[in-house]
Amino acid sequence: MAQATERFRRYLDDELGECRDEDVEQRLDELGTLEAALGTGRVDAELDVLSALANETRYTIVRVLVAAREELCVCELHAVVDVTESGLSHALSALVEAGLVDGRKDGRWKKYRATNRAVALVTVLEGSVSDD
């Protein structure tokens, strides 16, 4: 930590022309406020969502549901992803838990749709990758 603090002090010295202990304390307080504003619970929740997408099967399911713009039956999703029924069920459970898909029973069929959160994330991701 001492090495990091010294480097931080050198950075402030370069930025301010002269760095005093008060400058270091003030900037550390400002950075602490930024960190506190994030909130541990919020960061954990966001990481849970990203973790749910960090699997090819789950991400493919989300992409298909977003592209479909309608509910799809589990049997339709199973035709798209190359996993066992158990694997599909596990993936869908993780996506429901992360708030990326909603499921409902329709008679003897289980149907799923993408949530607004899933649509927003896929939209952002599509815009972050170029086709080049």
Model-derived regions: residue spans:
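Residue-level detector of secondary-structure transition/capping positions
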Residues: 69-70, 96, 126
